């Protein structure tokens, strides 16, 4: 008595257009393409149900809880202009559905199951609104932009980096030599590539030792603080932390993690260690395009960027707009603001579906990396501004005179662009002239 078994439409329970969202709700914007014959309201309700309390049939144990309190709600659906049978579904989730301080649990709940749902031809998570009531349960970046500048004693310009190439095959000693030449030439950072971990040709401990020697030698000769992103990513969390501990014992200022392949749990653990022990944390987004490149299915990078800010990282790769990797200018600047700023207004032209208030969570420096070189410097300086890292791999090591002259060229070009900008010159129009004048 009182329990009516059977399958019923999701929209009868989970489509609630009259719902007024709460300040504590986590809000999601999904781009959904229903299968032919599936109404948009049913598809949106299915997304809300399968990413919260629902299953395919009514169950007796529904009567032992309060679905009204815990269910996700599809509260709005809008058609996508210019697309046939495609919609943005807005879903509100009560805060109690999620474990505090766990990006892992957040993603397991919202995107863990629903993407294989057969009522949908395709589904993409476009944006999340993280309320302060939830974001305050995370430590966020280990240090943040201002603390990093204070640690490095570098202000008023973007920071310069370089990924050591070839990414695989160098011995530890030759790797250290390349690091020294780049840092001595004027770069602030050099970087392990994302797949440099601990391979037979270069074990991690040997690399760390030779890189530390290069760091201290270049610091002594230039009088500047230098860093190398020592990749601590490993097969286990225990091994990852062991490598981070060794980096700290050597006196290195920064370590690195591949946060998508390494996982959010490992990343958050490493971020806690870095905060407690004064290490900066550089984040590489290896594997992101598997998740974010398709327009209609997957997760947009702005969501992965928000997740990283909560999980913890001081730098993250964010595309270039001008280099070899894909990225639209306005959309890229949208998630760059989501990484750096405290308060970001809703702006659909930049792909920002919700106003995001990070309250006091530190910001993350966006890293522009991938196919960029010295002639891109004016555009990069204008697009990314001072709070960024501009990273030239082939654009440094590919210089015809060698690594150190490549580093010098990048540093001279950057300082010329910053000075020209500060003097009020138009970098977009005069960029090439500024670079040529600086090279004389």
Curated annotation (Swiss-Prot):
Name where it mostly resides.
plastid
Q: Which residues bind substrate?
A: 113, 163, 167, 285, 317, 369
Pfam families, A to Z: RuBisCO_large, RuBisCO_large_N
Question: Any keyword Calcium?
Answer: no
GO CC annotation terms, alphabetical: chloroplast
| Broad enzyme group | lyase
Positions of post-translational N6,N6,N6-trimethyllysine modification: 4
Q: Record's CDD domains?
A: RuBisCO_large_I
Where in or outside the cell it occurs: the entry states:
Plastid, Chloroplast
* Gene3D superfamilies per the UniProt record, alphabetical: Ribulose bisphosphate carboxylase, large subunit, C-terminal domain, RuBisCO large subunit, N-terminal domain
Q: Which cofactor does it need?
A: Mg(2+)
Residues annotated as carrying N6-carboxylysine in the record are 191
Q: How is the cofactor bound?
A: Binds 1 Mg(2+) ion per subunit.
Q: Which UniProt keywords apply?
A: Calvin cycle, Carbon dioxide fixation, Chloroplast, Disulfide bond, Lyase, Magnesium, Metal-binding, Methylation, Monooxygenase, Oxidoreductase, Photorespiration, Photosynthesis, Plastid
Q: Which GO terms describe its biological process?
A: photorespiration; reductive pentose-phosphate cycle
Residues at the catalytic site? 165 (proton acceptor), 284 (proton acceptor)
Task: Quote the subunit structure annotation.
Answer: Heterohexadecamer of 8 large chains and 8 small chains; disulfide-linked. The disulfide link is formed within the large subunit homodimers.
Something else known = The basic functional RuBisCO is composed of a large chain homodimer in a 'head-to-tail' conformation. In form I RuBisCO this homodimer is arranged in a barrel-like tetramer with the small subunits forming a tetrameric 'cap' on each end of the 'barrel'.
User: Record's NCBIfam families?
Assistant: PRK04208.1 (NF003252)
- Protein name (Swiss-Prot/TrEMBL): Ribulose bisphosphate carboxylase large chain
Organism, as annotated: Matteuccia struthiopteris
Q: Which gene encodes it?
A: rbcL
């Amino acid at each position: 008595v009182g329990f009516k078994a059977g399958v019923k439409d999701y929209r009868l329970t989970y489509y609630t257009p009259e719902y007024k969202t709460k300040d504590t709700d986590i809000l999601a914007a999904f781009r959904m393409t229903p299968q032919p014959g599936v109404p948009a309201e049913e598809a949106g309700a299915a997304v809300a149900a399968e990413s919260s309390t629902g299953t395919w049939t009514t169950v007796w144990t529904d009567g032992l809880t309060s679905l009204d309190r815990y269910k996700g709600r599809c509260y709005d659906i809008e058609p996508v202009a210019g697309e046939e049978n495609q919609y943005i579904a807005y879903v509100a989730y009560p805060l109690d559905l999620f474990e505090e301080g766990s990006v892992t649990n957040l993603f397991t709940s919202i995107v863990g199951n629903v993407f294989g749902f057969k009522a949908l031809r395709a589904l993409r998570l476009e944006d999340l609104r993280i309320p302060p009531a939830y974001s305050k349960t995370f430590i966020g970046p280990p240090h943040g932009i201002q603390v990093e500048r204070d640690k490095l004693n570098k202000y008023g310009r973007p920071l310069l980096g370089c990924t050591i190439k070839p990414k695989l095959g160098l011995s530890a000693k030759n790797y250290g030599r390349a690091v020294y030449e780049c840092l001595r030439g004027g770069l602030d950072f050099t970087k392990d590539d994302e797949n440099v971990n601990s391979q037979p040709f270069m074990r991690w401990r040997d690399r760390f030792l030779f890189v530390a020697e290069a760091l201290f030698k270049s610091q002594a000769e230039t009088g500047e603080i230098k860093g190398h992103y020592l990749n601590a990513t490993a097969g286990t969390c225990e091994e990852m932390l062991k490598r981070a501990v060794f980096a700290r014992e050597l006196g290195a200022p920064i370590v690195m993690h591949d946060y998508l392949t390494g996982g959010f749990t490992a990343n958050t653990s490493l971020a806690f260690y870095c905060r407690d022990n004064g290490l900066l944390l550089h984040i590489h987004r290896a594997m992101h395009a598997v998740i974010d490149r398709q327009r209609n299915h997957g997760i947009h990078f702005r969501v992965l960027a928000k997740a990283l800010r909560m999980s913890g990282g001081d730098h993250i790769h964010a595309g270039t707009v001008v280099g070899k990797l894909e990225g639209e200018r306005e959309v890229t600047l949208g998630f760059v603001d989501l990484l750096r700023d405290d308060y970001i207004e809703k702006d659909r032209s930049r792909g920002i579906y919700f106003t995001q208030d990070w309250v006091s969570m530190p910001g993350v420096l966006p890293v522009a990396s991938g196919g960029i070189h010295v002639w891109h410097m004016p555009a990069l300086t204008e697009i990314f501004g001072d709070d960024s890292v501009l990273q030239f791999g082939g654009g440094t090591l590919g210089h015809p005179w060698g690594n150190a002259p490549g580093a010098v060229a990048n540093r001279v070009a950057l300082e010329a662009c910053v000075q020209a900008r500060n003097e009020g010159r138009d970098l977009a129009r005069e960029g090439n002239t500024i670079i040529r004048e600086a090279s004389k």
